[in-house]
């Protein structure tokens, strides 16, 4: 009896540990140093939102992103209050990554708007007056939670899962490849950088959604003619999203907006017992430089 109980206890512990190891964690070994910081003084202030059940936080899965931009000369302040005109005052950039309408992504209401009407109006007015927004919303349910805020800037979020068997990692059709070779990188200061060293050649995403921007927006990551969208990761039904994007940039009043339909590509994470890498830490892509270029454009040093 004791032996049987002990076996059950060990089994439970193994399951718990395996589950914990399988979770996404920040890659704390990823090199976030910047040889030549963009800002050595007068650091732009970034508000990083943590007030809306965000899946990504400054000390959690997005720590590598935060460390990288801080090493580039920015000052990052986390926000745990409702967004308002007063709260946004004094900040140059607002970063929102994977907000939710409920505490957990599996909870009922997770895909409902994470932002109330007053917050959406405050952010819209702030951007119109010269602020810059980086809005990141992954596959379902994150797209649903950010859809109302995105819509206020003319951006449609599909809130599904984007696939492209012809332009993706072999055996992983949701991990999309955007390169100069496959012509899925848009022409924009973000993809060109300030010099040849900053020029983007290839980017990789890690399962996201499709976006449709207003006519004056620029698709940074274009979805090809073979791209499709499904409401669930394993859904049998899918629809074409040819002409959509997985990231786009636009100017709004005096401000600027970048909307990302995939989040992991802007951080560096590990998952599973084998510590599989996901994001900037995966070799063979320019995701790290892309993060820097996005922030350079939002802060204004890229015109």
Residue ranges with predicted function:
Residues 1-5:
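N-terminal secretory signal peptides that target proteins for export/translocation
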Residues 6-9, 25:
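Compositionally biased, intrinsically disordered low-complexity segments enriched
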Residues 8-19:
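Bacterial N-terminal signal peptides
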Residues 22-303:
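Short, surface-exposed patches at the edges or C-terminal ends of soluble domains, predominantly
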């Amino acid at each position: 009896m004791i032996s049987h109980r002990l076996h059950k206890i060990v089994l439970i512990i193994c399951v718990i540990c395996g589950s914990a190891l399988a979770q996404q964690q920040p890659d704390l070994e990823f090199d976030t140093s910047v040889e030549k910081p963009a800002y050595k003084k007068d650091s732009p202030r970034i508000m990083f939102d943590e007030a809306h059940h965000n899946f990504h936080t400054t000390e959690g899965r997005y720590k590598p992103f935060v460390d990288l931009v801080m090493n580039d000369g920015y000052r990052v302040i986390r926000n745990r209050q409702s967004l308002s005109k007063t709260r946004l005052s004094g900040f140059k950039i607002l970063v929102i990554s994977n907000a939710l309408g409920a505490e957990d992504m599996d909870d009922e209401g997770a895909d409902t708007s994470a932002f109330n009407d007053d917050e959406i109006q405050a952010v819209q007015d702030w951007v119109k007056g010269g602020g810059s927004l980086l809005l990141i919303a992954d596959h379902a349910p994150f797209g649903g939670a950010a859809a109302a805020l995105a819509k206020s800037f003319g951006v449609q979020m599909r809130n599904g899962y984007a696939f492209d068997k012809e332009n993706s990692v072999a055996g992983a059709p949701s991990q999309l490849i955007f390169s100069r070779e496959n012509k899925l990188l848009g022409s924009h200061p973000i993809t060109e950088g300030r010099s040849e060293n900053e020029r983007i050649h290839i980017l990789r995403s890690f399962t996201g959604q499709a976006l449709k921007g207003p006519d004056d927006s620029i698709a940074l990551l274009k979805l090809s003619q073979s791209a499709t969208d499904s409401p669930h990761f394993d859904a049998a039904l899918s629809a074409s999203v040819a002409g959509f994007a997985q990231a786009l940039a636009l100017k709004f009043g005096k401000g600027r907006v970048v909307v990302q339909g995939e989040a992991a590509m802007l951080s560096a994470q590990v998952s599973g017992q084998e510590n599989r890498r996901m994001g900037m830490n995966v070799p063979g892509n320019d995701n790290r430089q892309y993060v820097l270029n996005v922030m350079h454009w939002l802060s204004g040093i890229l015109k």
